[in-house]
Structures are given as structure tokens and as C-alpha cells.
Design a protein with these regions (language model features):
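Phosphate-binding glycine-rich loops and adjacent basic patches that engage nucleotide phosphates
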Residues: 76-83
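Short, glycine- and charge-enriched coil/turn segments that flank and shape catalytic ligand pockets
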Residues: 73-74, 177
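Extended hydrophobic
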Residues: 48, 52-68, 172-207
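Short, cationic low-complexity segments
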Residues: 84-98, 176-180
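Non-catalytic, conformational "gating/processing" segments within enzyme and secreted inhibitor domains
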Residues: 1-71, 78, 97-173
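A general marker of short, structured functional hotspots
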Residues: 75, 131, 182-184
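Short linear sequence elements within intrinsically disordered, low-complexity coil regions
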Residues: 31, 84, 140, 191-193
């Protein structure tokens, strides 16, 4: 049994100005609609046949925010059930370093705590829960791992992630005509810049 908590706090590499924050509507998973603040900026976007998303760099720590929104005809639950570890890690790497899209993301805060064993198994991480798992390099005793729980608290706003620090708005960032608006349930993750392994991962279903 492992109990872990994840804390990330940093400002954006390219921040938001006051004119980049506007109220809009978010279509909740439960069928209701919420009025929330949306943050708009030019970011590197990606897409495939089932989803689209973007990456946004953090200023100080070697991580970035990744958001993935399934297409309108695919529910978040269905997308998660079919999501593999390879797809999760590879999809954000398809972004172009020079092509930017206007992206609008809602401000959100999420607090959750519970078992992530099923989530890990769904993306192919199963050996650690079997008798074949070898933890001898880290522990003197023979251990069997039967569950992993994680407590996550994250807030995404115009200043950064779980951060009260002001980030400087980049008025020289390139702009495009097309846009991506995350106005329905999506996946968020804070990932390592090199490996794209998630430090924090979760979903925004209702605001």
C-alpha cells in the first residue's frame, strides 16, 4: 500500500494579461452549464482522430501543463477507458514548436483523494501489483503492493498552477485565427518536460 501526495506550484512561462480573461460557459458532465473565467493565449496544440489538446510551459520547474479534450461525440469516460499509456505519453509530443493556436481554458481547482490502482492498470501498469514485482532495490523486506492512493490538490488560474506569483504576460506571442476552447470535460496533467511522464493527472468534469 502506497499513499502519496502531489504538490506543484509555479507561474506560467508566458502569462495572461487582464484582457486575456473573459467569462464563458462550460458544459458539465452532469448536463448543467457553469459560468467560469476562461484564459486565452497562443499555445502549441495537437490533435488526433479522437481528441485535441495543448501544452503550456511553466516558468521555473521542468514541467508543462497538458490538457486533452475528447471530441464532442466521445464521452470523457469512454475516452479514458480506451486511453493507453503510450497514447497518453505520445500525443502531446506531436505539437509543432512553431505553430500556435488560440487556446481558451477555464480556471479550475480540483481536490481529490483515493485509489489510483484501477487508473494505473487501465494504462498498462499492472506488474507492480503482481507477485512478479521486484522491490528489492528499494526495500530490504519482500513486499507486495496491493494498492496506491494519491491525494491531489491543484488550482489553475491566470497566474499559474497553485501559485499566487504574478507571471508576466507575453504580448509578443504569435496569434492565429483558429482556436481551441476547452468548454467541456477534459483531462489535465502536469508532465515532465523530457519524458512526458505525469507528475499529476486528473479530469475536469464539472465546474
Amino acid at each position: 500500500y502506497i499513499d502519496s501526495s502531489a504538490i506543484v506550484s509555479d507561474s506560467w512561462l508566458r502569462g495572461y494579461g487582464e484582457s486575456d480573461v473573459k467569462q464563458g460557459s462550460f458544459s458539465n458532465q452532469n448536463g448543467s452549464t457553469a459560468k467560469v473565467n476562461f484564459l486565452t493565449s497562443a499555445e502549441r496544440a495537437f490533435s488526433d482522430e479522437d481528441a485535441e489538446g495543448f501544452v503550456k510551459d511553466l516558468k521555473s520547474i521542468p514541467c508543462k501543463l497538458v490538457c486533452i479534450m475528447p471530441n464532442k461525440d466521445i464521452s470523457l469516460e469512454k475516452y479514458l477507458n480506451e486511453l493507453t499509456a503510450d497514447r497518453l505519453l505520445n500525443l502531446p509530443t506531436t505539437v509543432s514548436p512553431t505553430d500556435f493556436t488560440n487556446v481558451s481554458i477555464p480556471e479550475f481547482s480540483v481536490e481529490s483523494s483515493g485509489s489510483i490502482k484501477k487508473n494505473l492498470e487501465n494504462i498498462g501498469i499492472t506488474t507492480i501489483f503482481s507477485s512478479d514485482a521486484d522491490f528489492s532495490k528499494g526495500f530490504a523486506e519482500n513486499l507486495i503492493l496491493n494498492d496506491v492512493t494519491q491525494a491531489v490538490s491543484i488550482s489553475v488560474n491566470k497566474n499559474g498552477i497553485s501559485s499566487d506569483n504574478q507571471s508576466e504576460a507575453d504580448k509578443n506571442a504569435p496569434k492565429t485565427e483558429e482556436g481551441l476552447v476547452l468548454d467541456r470535460p477534459f483531462i489535465y496533467a502536469v508532465v515532465d518536460n523530457e519524458s512526458y511522464l505525469p507528475v499529476i493527472i486528473g479530469t475536469v468534469s464539472n465546474l
